[in-house]
Amino acid sequence: MGKIIGIDLGTTNSCVSILEGNKAKVIENSEGDRTTPSIVAFTEDGEILVGQSAKRQAVTNPQNTLFAVKRLIGRKFTDDVVQKDISMVPYKIIAADNGDAWVEVKGDKKAPPQISAEVLKKMKKTAEDYLGETVTEAVITVPAYFNDSQRQATKDAGKIAGLDVKRIINEPTAAALAYGMDKSKGDSTIAVYDLGGGTFDISIIEIADVDGEHQFEVLSTNGDTFLGGEDFDLRLIEYLAEEFKKTNGIDLHNDPLALQRLKEAAEKAKIELSSSQQTEVNLPYITADATGPKHLVVKLSRAKLESLVEELVNRSLEPLKMAIKDAGVSVSDIDDVILVGGQTRMPMVQAAVAKFFGKEPRKDVNPDEAVAMGAAIQGAVLSGDVKDVLLLDVTPLSLGIETMGGVATPLIEKNTTIPTKKSQVFSTADDNQTAVTIHVVQGERKQASQNKSLGRFDLADIPPAPRGMPQIEVTFDIDANGILNVSAKDKATGKEQSIVIKASSGLSDDEIEKMVQDAEANADADRKFEEVVTARNTLEGLIHATKKTLEEAGDKATADEKSAIESAIAEAEEAAKGEDKDAMEAATKKLTEASSSLAQKLYAEQGAAGAGAAGAADAAADQPADDGAVDAEFEEVKEDDGK
């Protein structure tokens, strides 16, 4: 069996590593560098350049040089953040047929995984040149906060590059592996703060010595998939462009060549300001107008840069608070803080992290290489070369299905250790319903439509039965890559349907980064939504039961009673269409009162034996579940309910 290589597929830079003996080794590329820029260029003569060679020619070929493409994986073209990026990058971002954000190069439409595959090919070749043998298997890292479709897209990129991706592993977890492998035995809790080129993750990880085995257990993870070094660069680019516009009245955003030069200068200035207090951005002949050539010369201090990016640094602190809370630990329980990702070299970032945790981050972990090294260690675990390591990772976001009233009912909660399998029994919403749609969602919001839709499928041929009677068992099975398989089974017939969630379309805006934050910020709105849905479900259950009572025993009611009940039903149906909780509760009360005299007659007539049926109108408000079925039912599947 050949070596399983470890690849850190980064937004800005990528890195490849293998395990030699019991140590992870980072492999230098053909240019002699330990990291490779995640940049792909398409030249006039049809050549594809990757890495440093692509970066070198970017200024003369800006429209066909693609960088930070990882930020587009799983994103919708209409996403606000993608729209903002469009004006900031010199290459063309377009809408694919499914609404995803793709890129266009020399008239060809390309999906982000295709571009990422070119970088992976370079990593594969780097490893092959060093090992002197063909490499076919890899462990690839992704941001911990990547959703299901983004993970699937990363696997697809590996496939395009000719790699069998044995495992998708979270970047902070990989860094913890690299850090913890050679540490003395004993238990410790560490925080991995990973601020890379395009994404931010925080993971709280417990490293324990269990029966001589190194156990790495992720307690919680959080993050923001649209926060990274590229955003720091963009703040600086915006500032430089604005200063130039003030002086010369020319907007450099309209000039791809100037924009590319600005990007390079901004990145260089940002790096210089990590070790010096001041630098000068000097770009002669940046553009020209009727009066002649124009030059950009701007003096930049570290303090100015810090004022431009302060909001970005602060944005990374909210996920820290959530991760600590979700892990069930306090800041004082954290033994070590590990910094990962090139952007953590910025003194302001280091100071903010040190202040939050009340201790200095460790300096003995290489922020550019730790992730790839951890991936190589995981590869060796999978191939059996390393036997004393157990890695327990988690799923970053809750997974569930949409149930009656548009509620997202979670089956697997966020921060659940994976792999895992969970089943729950649901039922139908209508009498004689013969099909249900299973709509799979990912996220923390109570309202299904506010979460990321991962896919939907139908379970048909359910035998006709009263609502609430069929037993439909929904099973979620999430593998060690964090990729989901969902099945639904009618327990009466044994008929089953399943779906492996595929990356059919990506995120609609910066959803994934906002999911948990939104859930917190919108907790009040979510609570009100839940209350409205509960009131509506109660009212609709009562309407259904009362109508049934009228049909079966309407002749027992006087004309006045019947008229009052029908009037109350009409009012209740109208109230159920709205969003007013108070109106629904009032309608429930009125309908209960209107039907109570008929219910009492039936009760008196039928005695104890008929109590269940007679009380239906009164008790429907409580909606008891049948045979353990959860009272969150499916809507009936509609023929036109396509994607």
Curated annotation (Swiss-Prot):
In what ranges is there compositional bias, type Low complexity?
614-623
Location of region: Disordered: 608-643
The record's annotation in CDD domains points to:
ASKHA_NBD_HSP70_DnaK-like
Q: What induces it?
A: By stress conditions e.g. heat shock.
Signal peptide span: none
Any single GO molecular-function term of the entry would be: unfolded protein binding
**What start-end ranges are recorded for coiled-coil regions in this protein?**
none
Superkingdom of this protein's organism = Bacteria
Post-translational modification Phosphothreonine, affected residues: T199
Key words, A-Z: ATP-binding, Chaperone, Nucleotide-binding, Phosphoprotein, Stress response
Q: Where are the compositionally biased (Acidic residues) regions? A: 624-643
- UniProt family annotation: Belongs to the heat shock protein 70 family.
Q: What does this protein do?
A: Acts as a chaperone.
Q: What is this protein called?
A: Chaperone protein DnaK
